[in-house]
């Protein structure tokens, strides 16, 4: 059993308690023992900082989460639905239209993806159809592998995505 399996899902503080070490020492040991091959889920971001980032004109919404281990970040399964359900629909912190723009056309433009992010002739038809009142993010730190709710259809390159088949050229 590798070290990461033994500690998967535990916080650095919990591992420090088990190993009777300081948290910083635990992090260094884990990095060394796993040849830098660890993943860390940080959930301590200040909500006000996140709000300011999302509101900022240059702020784009994305996730760098990966499916690593049994306890990936809950945002792996709910970054975009969290923006739609909480930030736009419930808290009205950002308009739905602006939130979608910050998740689609703005990043595509900034990254130079010329046929992505907008619904136009000769563009890739990448579309998510959702039922706004039903959009929900059940993923939590303790139970992160929960699919978002309220997403009715996902269309990538003009094809309906079924059974997680990877349709996009960048995903193949």
Indicate residue ranges for each PLM-predicted region.
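Intein/HINT protein-splicing elements and their conserved insertion hotspots or analogous self-processing inserts
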Residues: 164-172
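Short, flexible loop segments at the rims of nucleotide/cofactor-binding pockets, characterized by
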Residues: 37-40, 107
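C-terminal cap of metal-dependent C-N hydrolases
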Residues: 51-58, 63-64, 128-165
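His/Asp/Glu-enriched, well-ordered alpha-helical/loop segment
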Residues: 4-32, 46-132
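A generic structural signal for well-ordered coil/turn residues at beta-strand boundaries
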Residues: 124, 150, 170-171
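Short, small-hydrophobic-rich alpha-helical interface motif
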Residues: 1-2, 158
């Amino acid at each position: 059993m590798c070290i990461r399996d033994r500690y998967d899902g535990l916080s650095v503080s919990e591992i420090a308690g088990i190993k009777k070490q300081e948290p910083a020492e635990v992090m260094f040991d884990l990095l060394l023992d796993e040849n830098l091959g660890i993943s860390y889920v940080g959930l301590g971001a200040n909500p006000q900082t996140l709000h300011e980032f999302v509101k900022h004109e240059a702020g784009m919404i994305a996730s760098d989460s990966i499916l690593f281990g049994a306890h990936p970040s809950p945002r792996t399964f709910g970054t975009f639905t969290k923006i739609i359900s909480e930030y736009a629909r419930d808290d009205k912190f950002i308009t739905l239209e602006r939130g979608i723009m910050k998740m689609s056309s703005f990043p595509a433009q900034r990254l130079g993806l010329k046929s992505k992010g907008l619904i136009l002739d000769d563009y890739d038809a990448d579309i998510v159809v959702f039922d706004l009142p039903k959009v929900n993010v059940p993923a939590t730190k303790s139970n992160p592998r929960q699919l978002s709710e309220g997403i009715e259809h996902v269309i990538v390159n003009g094809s309906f995505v079924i059974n997680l088949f990877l349709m996009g050229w960048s995903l193949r």
